């Protein structure tokens, strides 16, 4: 067999094994060990080809003994329950298409076959991640970087590889480098690539030509040798938390930059949270973070947004980080990230119209319960449960509340019944019956909120009884106008019947009912308004006062009504009605302007004008929240008090939310509807909120602050004005004390405040010292003690105490001390010894200085040759000063034998004069001694033996024995002369 065939043999074997694994998967493939069967169905992820029957949901999630389980969003849930209407989060895709009622959710599929490695125990930096029940591994496919054995183009020297890694599939296993992160290896992530291997095999097997086979083998060999495997620079993490560290320079191939991948996979139902603990990149290096688990990677962040302390969250349980560095020696940079798993949650469910929702938890296992208002029925599941998955989701779609066609309402106290589809149009061929039954001993009252029937055979009948045979008290066939005062039942029942034919539709009807006791008036009602009463049960004598919501006006009734007639209690006036009228004037500082008859459709051919007026030094902000008018209708805003003022804006047709600001204290609003336009539907018109605001050429007026005052730089708060806030003694400014009016007419900072000072300011450190503090925040009573370093002296008080002062802020008991270099007194200069010298010749010597002493020739130094000025208070010499004594014969003969002096070096050779002095000086001394004795005896006897002439004797001192010279000439060692300090 040729060498080329030998090279081709491993490739053929690998392809054969791969093909077998794809065609005939082994038993249990794609199913993790420990995967159990529930309700006759496996918990493995389904495929897109499988249908979506309403089967029992089975999940791979364990019971909710979860790691890193954060507290539930209690505050968020409470806030959401208090709101009337909540916006749902945007729907997120689920990777489990077989779960019940997931009709509209996209399906995440694997683009390539996956070979699942056997799972092992997951590891992390913190130790093993263990659960009570081992979770099965899910099959997940994402893009994989090139690995060993994959042929990719090799960048040239200095060229940076910036192409994305080839598409592939990888399977994160529970085993991973959660503790330190281990390099990627083919055993961890199986992949298939489009390398053209199949074509190569076909060519080599189909042809018997050896030359062709050799050529093919050469091509394959060349492709493999050009690979720059990034194996040491790719890691797979599967623990619940860990660290991502930048690779070292040793990981970088020669002349090629690094292209590193960090793959993170946590347990489904958790997301990946990455925190930037440190990052320092070189110019040209990139770091990208993506969320995985969907059909396409989700970009989360790159090096432009990665700052220290930043937190990035992936909405799925997989994430990837890619680091690309420059070739050596420029790179690589450094970074240190920490990741951890966090519990994912379902989105907040949408509140149904005419209903409410109550949520226990948004995390897996939580539930949402729905209910509808009276007169509406729930269509859909009443209870939803949050299921654990790659992205948690509700087990069903949110229900809706629809108006029921008929029904029995027993113990009816207060509520409403509406026609099917209300406030929209009802459908054809309806026959609906409602039976209202009040509690025992009470009667019913009906208010007509709205009745709109088609002008044909559609009919509304209200009967004073409990069946279709009861006498009618209202029949739409016979009554043209609705009774403003409503209807009263003679017993505890009302029977309502609505029938429609096969042609024509309308909005239908809305009736409000109230039950009331005998001897009392019924509860009044005003649509789009409120009322206050003097008694909650409305007995005789009760008074009620009505008011309308902003934008509405009271009509057709009295503002105050009273319950009268004890025998047959009733209101002395009918309840008023609140309607949105065409035109009006207002001087309120805030309010609402509504289209005529809102929320009902406005009429055709209307021309309405509203005027809004505020104080002269104020301006008006118009907040147009709803604008749904016909294309032939016109809404115009004038910046003034009449139609000749400047036009702020003119609009036709529907438009989104926007705002307008006036330059005057007045605004005029004109609405003109098209006479020939068709009738619009419900909630067609406009809603405009207006507010009084400060002048729009100045910043808003700043208020005074307690315990302080403000000082503006000029009276008018125009652009550039500076306002300075100061506090009274004993208080300090919290926040910025200087605010500036900016170009956008807003203040540069938030309003500060004055806070009572209860602590002293930090006195600070003292140079060349250390301090001991009793409390780090320096409250009243705290102490600070300063201790100087060695060689320094404290000047001032060493102990400071924080004292409270009623009239001002707390203050330290003394000023901060100082540590000065210790100044020591010098030593006084010593006189040179007699027959000797000292060096240096100074009058004063600083502490630490040294003085050297020496003797003249023929004298010996007794004492220390060098003494030092010892620092102190006061400074003193280390030893007494030495003296120079003359040499003596005793010293010369002190030795038991004469030691011949060693000849010194050539530099210290004795000259002849010194040698003569050393010999004759003792002789002279002896002669003087003999002469002295002689003269003594001669004087004692009165005459001289030598008969010398008498002369006046000269005085002389008595020579004592101490005057004898010691002779050091023959001492062992060198001879001692002036300047030699040794004896």
Swiss-Prot record:
Name one process (GO BP) from the record: synapse maturation
Gene name on record?
A: SEZ6
Which organism does this record belong to? Answer: Bos taurus
Biased composition annotated in UniProt, kind: Polar residues: 101-112
State the membrane topology: Single-pass type I membrane protein
| Signal peptide positions (record) | 1-19
Q: What does this protein do?
A: May play a role in cell-cell recognition and in neuronal membrane signaling. Seems to be important for the achievement of the necessary balance between dendrite elongation and branching during the elaboration of a complex dendritic arbor. Involved in the development of appropriate excitatory synaptic connectivity.
User: Which regions span the lipid bilayer?
Assistant: 915-935
Q: Where is the composition biased (Pro residues)?
A: 154-167
* CDD domains the UniProt entry points to: CCP, CUB
Q: Where in the cell is it found?
A: Cell membrane
Cystines in this chain:
346-386, 372-401, 405-432, 521-563, 548-578, 582-608, 699-741, 727-754, 760-802, 788-819, 827-869, 855-884
- Keywords assigned by UniProt? Cell membrane, Disulfide bond, Glycoprotein, Membrane, Repeat, Signal, Sushi, Transmembrane, Transmembrane helix
| Designated name of the protein | Seizure protein 6 homolog
InterPro entries tied to this protein: CUB_dom (IPR000859), SEZ6_CSMD_C4BPB_Regulators (IPR051277), Sperma_CUB_dom_sf (IPR035914), Sushi/SCR/CCP_sf (IPR035976), Sushi_SCR_CCP_dom (IPR000436)
Record GO cellular component, one term: neuronal cell body
Q: Which ranges carry the CUB domain?
A: 405-516, 582-693
Would you identify the family this protein belongs to, as annotated? Answer: Belongs to the SEZ6 family.
The residues that the database entry marks as glycosylated are 278, 388, 425, 530
> Where does the Sushi domain start and stop, copy by copy?
344-403, 519-580, 697-756, 758-821, 825-886
Q: Where is this region: Disordered?
A: 80-132, 148-194
Q: Name one Pfam family in it.
A: CUB
């Amino acid at each position: 067999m040729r060498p080329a065939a030998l090279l081709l043999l491993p490739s053929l074997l690998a392809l054969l094994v791969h093909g077998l694994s794809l065609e005939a998967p082994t038993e249990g493939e794609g199913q993790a060990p420990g995967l159990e069967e529930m309700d006759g169905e496996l918990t493995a992820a389904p495929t897109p080809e499988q249908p979506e029957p309403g089967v029992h949901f089975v999940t791979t999630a364990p019971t909710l003994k979860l790691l890193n389980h954060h507290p539930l969003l209690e505050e968020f849930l409470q806030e959401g329950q208090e709101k009337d209407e909540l916006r749902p989060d945007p729907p997120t895709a689920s990777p489990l298409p077989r779960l019940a009622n997931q009709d509209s959710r996209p399906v995440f599929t694997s683009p390539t076959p996956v070979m699942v490695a056997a799972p092992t125990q997951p590891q992390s930096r913190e130790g093993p991640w263990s659960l009570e029940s081992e979770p099965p591994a899910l099959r997940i496919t994402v893009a994989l970087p090139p690995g060993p054995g994959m042929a990719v183009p090799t960048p040239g020297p200095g060229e940076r590889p910036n192409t994305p890694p080839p598409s592939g599939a990888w399977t994160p296993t529970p085993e991973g480098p959660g503790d330190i992160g281990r390099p990627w290896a083919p055993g961890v992530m199986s992949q298939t690539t489009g390398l053209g291997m199949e074509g190569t095999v076909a060519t080599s097997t189909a042809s018997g030509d050896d030359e062709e086979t050799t050529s093919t083998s050469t091509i394959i060999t060349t492709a493999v040798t050009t690979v720059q495997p990034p194996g040491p620079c790719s890691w797979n993490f599967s623990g619940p938390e860990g660290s991502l560290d930048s690779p070292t320079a040793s990981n970088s191939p020669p002349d090629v930059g690094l292209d590193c991948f960090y793959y993170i996979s946590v347990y489904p139902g958790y997301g990946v949270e990455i925190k930037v603990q440190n990052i320092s990149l070189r110019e040209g290096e990139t770091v990208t973070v993506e969320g995985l688990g969907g059909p396409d990677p989700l970009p989360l962040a790159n090096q432009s947004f990665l700052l220290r302390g930043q937190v990035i969250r992936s909405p799925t349980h997989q994430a990837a980080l890619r680091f690309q560095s420059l070739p050596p020696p420029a790179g690589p940079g450094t970074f240190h990230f920490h990741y951890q798993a966090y519990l994912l949650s379902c989105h907040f469910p949408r509140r149904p119209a005419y209903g409410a929702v109550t949520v226990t938890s948004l995390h897996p296992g939580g539930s949402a319960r729905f209910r509808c208002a009276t007169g509406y029925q729930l269509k859909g599941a009443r209870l939803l449960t949050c299921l654990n998955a790659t992205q948690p989701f509700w087990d069903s779609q949110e229900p809706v509340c629809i108006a029921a066609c008929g029904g029995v309402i027993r113990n009816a106290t207060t509520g409403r019944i509406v026609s099917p589809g209300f406030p929209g149009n009802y459908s054809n061929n309806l026959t609906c019956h409602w039976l209202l039954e009040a509690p025992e001993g009470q009667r019913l009252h009906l208010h007509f909120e709205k009745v709109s029937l088609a002008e044909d055979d559609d009919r509304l009948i209200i009967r004073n009884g409990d069946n279709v045979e009861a006498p009618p008290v209202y029949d739409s066939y016979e009554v043209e106008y609705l009774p403003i005062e409503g209807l009263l039942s003679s017993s505890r029942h009302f029977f309502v019947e609505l029938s429609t034919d096969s042609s024509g539709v309308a909005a239908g009807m809305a009736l409000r009912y109230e039950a009331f006791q005998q001897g009392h008036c019924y509860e009044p009602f005003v649509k789009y308004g409120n009322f206050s009463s003097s008694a909650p049960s409305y007995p005789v004598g009760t008074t009620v006062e009505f008011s309308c919501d902003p934008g509405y006006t009271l009509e057709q009734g009295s503002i105050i009504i009273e319950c009268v007639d004890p025998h047959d209690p009733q209101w002395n006036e009918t309840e008023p009605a609140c309607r949105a009228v065409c035109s009006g004037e207002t001087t309120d500082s805030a309010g609402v302007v509504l289209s005529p008859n809102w929320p009902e459709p406005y009429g055709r051919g209307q021309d309405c004008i509203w005027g809004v007026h505020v104080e002269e030094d104020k301006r008006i902000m118009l907040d147009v929240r709803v604008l749904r008018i016909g294309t032939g209708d016109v809404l115009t805003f004038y910046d003034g008090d009449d139609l000749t003022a400047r036009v702020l804006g003119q609009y036709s047709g529907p438009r989104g939310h926007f705002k307008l600001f006036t330059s005057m204290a007045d605004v005029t609003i004109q609405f003109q509807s098209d006479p020939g336009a068709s009738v619009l539907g419900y909630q067609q018109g406009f809603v405009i909120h207006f507010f009084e605001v400060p002048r729009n050429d100045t910043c808003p007026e700043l208020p005074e602050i307690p315990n302080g005052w403000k000082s503006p730089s000029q009276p008018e708060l125009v652009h550039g004005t500076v306002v300075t806030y100061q506090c009274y003694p004993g208080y300090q400014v919290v926040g910025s004390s200087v605010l500036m009016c900016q170009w956008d007419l807003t203040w540069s900072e938030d309003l500060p405040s004055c806070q009572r000072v209860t602590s002293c300011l930090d006195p600070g450190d003292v140079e060349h010292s250390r301090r001991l503090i009793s409390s780090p925040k320096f409250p009243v009573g705290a102490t600070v003690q300063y201790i100087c370093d060695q060689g320094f002296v404290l000047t001032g008080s060493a102990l400071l105490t924080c004292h409270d002062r009623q009239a001002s802020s707390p203050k330290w008991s003394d000023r901060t001390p100082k540590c000065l270099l210790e100044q020591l007194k010098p030593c006084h200069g010593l006189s040179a010894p007699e027959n000797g010298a000292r060096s240096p010749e100074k009058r004063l010597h600083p502490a630490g200085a040294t003085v050297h002493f020496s003797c003249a020739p023929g004298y010996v130094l007794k004492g220390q040759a060098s003494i030092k000025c010892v620092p102190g208070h006061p400074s003193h010499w280390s030893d007494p000063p030495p003296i120079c004594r003359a040499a003596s014969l005793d010293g010369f003969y002190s030795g038991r034998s004469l030691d011949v002096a060693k000849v010194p070096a050539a530099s210290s050779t004795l000259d002849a004069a010194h040698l003569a002095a050393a010999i004759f000086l003792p002789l002279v001394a002896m002669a003087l001694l003999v002469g002295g004795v002689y003269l003594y005896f001669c004087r004692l006897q009165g005459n001289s033996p030598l008969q010398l002439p008498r002369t006046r004797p000269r005085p002389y001192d008595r020579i004592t024995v101490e005057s004898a010279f010691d002779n050091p000439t023959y001492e062992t060692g060198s001879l001692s002369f002036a300047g030699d300090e040794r004896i």
